[in-house]
C-alpha cells in the first residue's frame, strides 16, 4: 500500500506532509519552500503556472491569475459573499448554468473553482512524489470545520480531478489538534483551536483523553465563518490605500486591474511587516497615470491604524468562540490550552483578542502554517495503519434536516453530532391520495427552511393512495466520516425506497468531473512536454554560449571551413529554438555538438603543430650552439704603439 499524504488546501497557501519514520514530515516544494501559494495562472503561450511562479507574474497578468478560489468553491454565484468578492479580485467571476460561481480568463475560458484547486493539489501531489520517488494516489485533504456539504463535496471533486483518491476529508482545527496533541502527555485536557486562515475562520473545542491506552480526540463543538480570513484583512488595507490615493490624486485605482494587483501585494506585505514593527511605508512608484503624467503612491501605515481598520473583523471572530463554548457546555476557564492556527494569527491584535477571551495566553509552539497538513498526514497514517492507538471523533458543523409543511425546517441530525452517524424520522403526506412526496434536504440553523442551505431535492413516488396523514414515510440521514451526507426515503407500507448521495444541486456532475479529469490528464501530458521542451532549449542555449566562447578563443587558430561549419550549425540551432519542435532542437543541438568537437580538434591540432615548429627551432638553435669551438688565445702586446 502506498503512502496516504496529508494536504492542507489553504485559501492563501497550501502544504503537504507525510508520515516518515513514525513522524509527520512537511515536504519542501521544488522551490525549496514548505508552503506553496494557492495561486494558478494561465499565460499567453498556454503555460499553466502554480504557486510562487504564478504569484510572481500576477502583477502583469492579473485577469488570468486566480487566487483565493477556496472562498468560491461549492458556492452559488448569488451568494452575498461571492458578490462581495467580485469587487475585490481582478479576475472574472460569473454564474455557471447550474448557478454555481465559476471563474473566467480574459479570453473567455470558464472554469470551476474545483479545477483551479485541482491544479494546486496536483502541485502538492508532485511535491510528495518527487520526495518519495514513487507515485502517490491517496490523500487526506483538510477543509474548514464550518464547510457545508456542498463545499466538502466540491473539495473531494477537486481531489478526483487532480488524480487523487481522497480517503478522508478532515476538519482543519481537528487536524491541528492531532498535530499538537499526538505526542503530548499529561492526562485529559480540553483545548480550543482558533484557526484564522487566509479566507476562512473556525474554532473547535476538542477533548484529548487517554481511553484504554488509546489517545482519543473528541470534538465537542465547532463553529466559524467560511468568509472571514486574511484576505478580508488585506482588503481593508487596500480600501484604505485606494481611498487615500483618491483623496490625494482624484483617481480611483479600483478601476485599474494592474494597480489593484500591485496594491494587493503591497497590502499583504504591509500587514505582515506591522506584526513586528509599529510603522511601515507603502511605496508604489508609477502605480497609474493620467493626462498630467505618471502617479506614485506613497502612504505611511501604522500598526494602530491597521488595528483600527480591522477591529470589527477581529471581534467577528470572537463570537463563534463564545457559541462553540456554549455548545460544548463549557466556560472559557475550562479550557486548558489555546492553539493558534493560520497565518493571520501572527497579528498581535488577534493574539491579544484570543488571550482576553479565553483568559490565557495562546501557545506559541505550534507552527500555524504547517500544523493542519501535519494533522492530515497523521490521519493518513491512521487510515493506512501506520499510526496506532489514535481515535478521532469529529462532528458535523451544521444541523441537517428536511423542509416540512408550512416551510418549516425539521432537523434530523443536530449540529455538533459526532460523525459518522445515522438518524431517521417518520413523516406523512400533506394531502389526500398523495402518490409521491418531495424530500427537500437542507443544512443550517434557521427555523424557516428558505433561509438554510439547500442540498438536494428528490421524489419518492409509488405511495398507495390514502387519506392525508396515513402513509408513513421514513426519512433516514447517514453522514460518513468525511461529513458527507447520504439520504434515503422509504414508504413503510410498500417498502419502496429512494436513496441519494447528496451531490448538491450545485456542484459538478459526474460527466463534468470526468471531463475535467481528462483535461487534467491531457494538461499533465502537455506540461511534461513543455518541461522537456524547456530542458532542450536550456541545453541548446548553454551549448550556443559555450560554442561562441570557443570561436572567440580558438577561431584564429583554425581554418575558415571549420568556422563556417560551426557558424552554420549555430544559425540552424538558433532558428530551431524560435519554434516548439523539441526533436528538431535536439537534432540541431547534436549537429552543433559535432561541429564544436571538430573546432576543438582543429584548434588542438593547430596548437600541436605550433608546438612542433617551436621544438624544431629550438633543436636547430641547440645544434648551432654545439658547433661553436672553444679556442685558447694569448694576448699579443704591440710594442709598436
Swiss-Prot record:
Induction: By stress conditions e.g. heat shock.
Annotated protein name in UniProt: Chaperone protein DnaK
Keyword Cell membrane tagged: no
UniProt family annotation: Belongs to the heat shock protein 70 family.
SUPFAM superfamilies for the chain: Actin-like ATPase domain, Heat shock protein 70kD (HSP70), peptide-binding domain
Known function: Acts as a chaperone.
NCBIfam families (UniProt xref): PRK00290.1 (NF001413), PRK05183.1 (NF003520), prok_dnaK (TIGR02350)
Annotated region (Disordered), positions in chain: 606-628
Record key words, sorted: ATP-binding, Chaperone, Nucleotide-binding, Phosphoprotein, Stress response
Signal peptide: none
Superkingdom of this protein's organism: Bacteria
Low complexity: bias regions: 606-623
Residues modified as Phosphothreonine: 200
Pfam families reported in the protein's UniProt record: HSP70
Amino acid at each position: 500500500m502506498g503512502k496516504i499524504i496529508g494536504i492542507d488546501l489553504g485559501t492563501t497557501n497550501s502544504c503537504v506532509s507525510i508520515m516518515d519514520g513514525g513522524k509527520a514530515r512537511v515536504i519542501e516544494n521544488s522551490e525549496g519552500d514548505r508552503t506553496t501559494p494557492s495561486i494558478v495562472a494561465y499565460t499567453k503561450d498556454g503555460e499553466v503556472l502554480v504557486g510562487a511562479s504564478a504569484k510572481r507574474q500576477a502583477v502583469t497578468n492579473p485577469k488570468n491569475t486566480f487566487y483565493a478560489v477556496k472562498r468560491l468553491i461549492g458556492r452559488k454565484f448569488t451568494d452575498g459573499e461571492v458578490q462581495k468578492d467580485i469587487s475585490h479580485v481582478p479576475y472574472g467571476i460569473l454564474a455557471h448554468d447550474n448557478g454555481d460561481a465559476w471563474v473566467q480568463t480574459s479570453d473567455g475560458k470558464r472554469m470551476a473553482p474545483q479545477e483551479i484547486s485541482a491544479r494546486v493539489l496536483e502541485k502538492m501531489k508532485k511535491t510528495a512524489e518527487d520526495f518519495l520517488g514513487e507515485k502517490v494516489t491517496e490523500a487526506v485533504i483538510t477543509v474548514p470545520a464550518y464547510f457545508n456539504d456542498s463545499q466538502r463535496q466540491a473539495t473531494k471533486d477537486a481531489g478526483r480531478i487532480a488524480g487523487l483518491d481522497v480517503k478522508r476529508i478532515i476538519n482543519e482545527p481537528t487536524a491541528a489538534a492531532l498535530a499538537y496533541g499526538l505526542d503530548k502527555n499529561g492526562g485529559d485536557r480540553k483545548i480550543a483551536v482558533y484557526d484564522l486562515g487566509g479566507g476562512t475562520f473556525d474554532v473547535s473545542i476538542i477533548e484529548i483523553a487517554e481511553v484504554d491506552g488509546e489517545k482519543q480526540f473528541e470534538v465537542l463543538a465547532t463553529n466559524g465563518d467560511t468568509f472571514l480570513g486574511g484576505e478580508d484583512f488585506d482588503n481593508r488595507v487596500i480600501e484604505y490605500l485606494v481611498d487615500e490615493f483618491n483623496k490625494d490624486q482624484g483617481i480611483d485605482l479600483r478601476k485599474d486591474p494592474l494597480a489593484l494587483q500591485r496594491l494587493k501585494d503591497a497590502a499583504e506585505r504591509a500587514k505582515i511587516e506591522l506584526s513586528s514593527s509599529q510603522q511601515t511605508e507603502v511605496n508604489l512608484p508609477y502605480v497609474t497615470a493620467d493626462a498630467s503624467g505618471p502617479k506614485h503612491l506613497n502612504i505611511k501605515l501604522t500598526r494602530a491604524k491597521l488595528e483600527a481598520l480591522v477591529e470589527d473583523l477581529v471581534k467577528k471572530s470572537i463570537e463563534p468562540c463564545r457559541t462553540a463554548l456554549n455548545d460544548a457546555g463549557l466556560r472559557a476557564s475550562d479550557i486548558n490550552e489555546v492553539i493558534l492556527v493560520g497565518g493571520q494569527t501572527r497579528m498581535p491584535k488577534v493574539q491579544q483578542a484570543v488571550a482576553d477571551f479565553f483568559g490565557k495566553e495562546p501557545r506559541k509552539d505550534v507552527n500555524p502554517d504547517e500544523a493542519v497538513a501535519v494533522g492530515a498526514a497523521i490521519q493518513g497514517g491512521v487510515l493506512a495503519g501506520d499510526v496506532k492507538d489514535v481515535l478521532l471523533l469529529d462532528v458535523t458543523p451544521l444541523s441537517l434536516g428536511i423542509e416540512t409543511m408550512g416551510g418549516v425546517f425539521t432537523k434530523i441530525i443536530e449540529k455538533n453530532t459526532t460523525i459518522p452517524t445515522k438518524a431517521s424520522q417518520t413523516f406523512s403526506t400533506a394531502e389526500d391520495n398523495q402518490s409521491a412526496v418531495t424530500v427537500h434536504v437542507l443544512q443550517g440553523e434557521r427555523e424557516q427552511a428558505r433561509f438554510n442551505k439547500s442540498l438536494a431535492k428528490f421524489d419518492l413516488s409509488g405511495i398507495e393512495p390514502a387519506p392525508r396523514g396515513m402513509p408513513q414515510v421514513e426519512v433516514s440521514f447517514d453522514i460518513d466520516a468525511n461529513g458527507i451526507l447520504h439520504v434515503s426515503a422509504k414508504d413503510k407500507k410498500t417498502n419502496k425506497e429512494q436513496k441519494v448521495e447528496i451531490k448538491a444541486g450545485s456542484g459538478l456532475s459526474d460527466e463534468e468531473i470526468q471531463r475535467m479529469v481528462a483535461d487534467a490528464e491531457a494538461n499533465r501530458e502537455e506540461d511534461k512536454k513543455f518541461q522537456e521542451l524547456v530542458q532542450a532549449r536550456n541545453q541548446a542555449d548553454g551549448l550556443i554560449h559555450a560554442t561562441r566562447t570557443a570561436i572567440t578563443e580558438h577561431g584564429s587558430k583554425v581554418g575558415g571551413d571549420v568556422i563556417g561549419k560551426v557558424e552554420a550549425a549555430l544559425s540552424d540551432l538558433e532558428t530551431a529554438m524560435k519554434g516548439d519542435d523539441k526533436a528538431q532542437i535536439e537534432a540541431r543541438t547534436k549537429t552543433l555538438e559535432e561541429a564544436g568537437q571538430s573546432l576543438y580538434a582543429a584548434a588542438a591540432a593547430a596548437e600541436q603543430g605550433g608546438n612542433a615548429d617551436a621544438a624544431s627551432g629550438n633543436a636547430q638553435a641547440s645544434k648551432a650552439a654545439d658547433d661553436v669551438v672553444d679556442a685558447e688565445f694569448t694576448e699579443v702586446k704591440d710594442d709598436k704603439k
